[in-house]
């Protein structure tokens, strides 16, 4: 994740059970270790002041300035998924055992306020719950509701005139195909990656178009909260990648979207889609940056953050190296990268890796056969990390 002002990036450390926040300008990293090996750590959103939210077992706030992680409640009681650019508002959910999806909430100074959920009658389909994912400074909230087909149609909440209560607006209702018998052209679902621009104007959506033959194609959409219009870019519009999938992960205040094409579980190629322009891979949009082609070749290039002004982009990728680590027969590992689109040398930089983070100790083919050091086969490769965890990559 990247803060709207471009100063901070945050995520998880590969090769160890910890989260991190990195100050791009000061070149300083703060890590937040999990209390034990079985505890999951995730950073889901970060504000301009270096305060991030996510979970470290229970819901958690990660503060760059104090270098402290503060947890709230018990594990699985609360979930923090987004924070406003000014760091004052947090969105997520609370769980009391009555709703599998939880109750969407706005947290203001640690106090949860339940967000209303639209009725099944209004939705035209049965809802199993809802979730809030991101929030702007003026309390516009984006998220989704969950239907019987387990998709996640997009949903907005906006404050009422009293400034305290909210109304739900399922803007995807006019585009959502609730079944394969539906005459609606699109099934708009937002998944966990969907976020809103810092100014609350745009929402990036992942889209599945149902085809007449019973199949589907995937694309990305840009929703304008001010005029209720949706723009689409489908995978079929990409030459040579018609059968791939598109996933948008972040959007700037001017509607620029970054994400990846390929698949969440196979080869990923980073893309940028500026408003009024054609979607391009990062390697096409910035041909002087050789690193982007290298990251694409690694099969895991995933731009996942963009600053509010669209200048700074951050992501992660798998990168090969020519030499193996002394305690590994394999080369390469995961890297977190950040890029200034106006930087005069048109180069891309990597965040400093934690000691041992992202190291790959062995590689296996899809059928479980161990590969020789440095060798690769087409298709899925399974990587064994130094900490015992595994990760899939896809080689073209």
List the predicted regions and their residue ranges.
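C-terminal outer-membrane/trafficking sorting elements
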Residues: 347-396
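Conserved "turn/edge" positions that cap or connect secondary-structure elements
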Residues: 1-344
